[in-house]
């Protein structure tokens, strides 16, 4: 890449970043937090944060990358995607009606709410315990990270249930919403994330999600400022780099350490070059249509229920890894959201996918506002827990693609909804058995005397 080509890419990158960052800043000033703000920051991180890292790798370490015209296509496709997404998100198809009384779909009381978070926590802890009994601490047993996906590890499906510890702790926080509950959320979820990191053998997702939710709650409540958020972001990047070194068993120093930091940070937070690789091999891609979305559900079907279930699931990530990169190491490499759309239907699917994503984020914001307006604090805690708990799925959406997001959000919805139903059933059983007693609040003495 010549300096002239780099200068052109830099101008496009600066304009695109400024465009998205400006819209995000105005939205932040208006509402302080909603899921449009979160997705916009996540989109910036995924598709634009990596460009400076790539530039340093190219000019400092002479690392080979896709041709400049392909990198330009990747930057422009990301900017155009966000433009279509933003217009879709802001467009109202019907007039907004405020304060119209509607019959609630469901309601919650104190006992049902506490039962719900206990059930969610139980699902996570029992899954971790069973996985540990089968495999022990994989971080200290395995020699490479790819072995996690080998036949040496049993009960891999249980990992999908670990995450429900976070929405359980979110319910606990939203019932109190004070600084002590906020700090308790951080300590409990990060401790659980470190435990699963050691047991699973290097999975950092639970730690990243817990820390991100903690920061956004702090921003919403005004407990942390923007400069504190930036400092925490730098700390998070360094922390993720250290965990990655431990995961891959790397011992580096000097220039090698700087090089390793650059490419691991890029691959962890901003795999934008994967989109460029897909565009570079565009003519070799056999468009998969909507099949990757259907195939991604296969992993949730147990083999005893479907004996002939394919052992290899050809979703967009695996198609990119196996067919485009010809990589059969056992790891699935993230194609990114736009990359998954390219795999499914080429360039035509990019604006269509942007419209779908805009509607998805709009729905989450509607649910979040519903929780903000809800007078029943127990129901509000459940709604907010569901919305913030789905942050993991939004990260999957940006990094892994639309197919992975759809299967995971449906799975999350089913497990969360089942926990609610079980909590309501248990409450009905306890109430029928006479085990539920209403709390009686005694009036202060002076107030009682005034009524006599």
UniProtKB/Swiss-Prot annotation:
Its main location: membrane. It comes from the Bacteria. Keywords: Cell inner membrane, Cell membrane, Membrane, Transmembrane, Transmembrane helix. The chain crosses the membrane at residues 6-26, 37-57, 63-83, 118-138, 155-175, 181-201, 207-227, 228-248, 341-361, 378-398, 410-430. It is found in: Cell inner membrane. It is a multi-pass membrane protein. GO terms for biological process: enterobacterial common antigen biosynthetic process. Pathway: Bacterial outer membrane biogenesis; enterobacterial common antigen biosynthesis. It holds the Pfam family WzyE. One of its GO terms (cellular component) is plasma membrane. Probably involved in the polymerization of enterobacterial common antigen (ECA) trisaccharide repeat units. Probably part of a complex composed of WzxE, WzyE and WzzE. Belongs to the WzyE family. This is Probable ECA polymerase. It comes from Salmonella typhimurium (strain LT2 / SGSC1412 / ATCC 700720). The gene is wzyE.
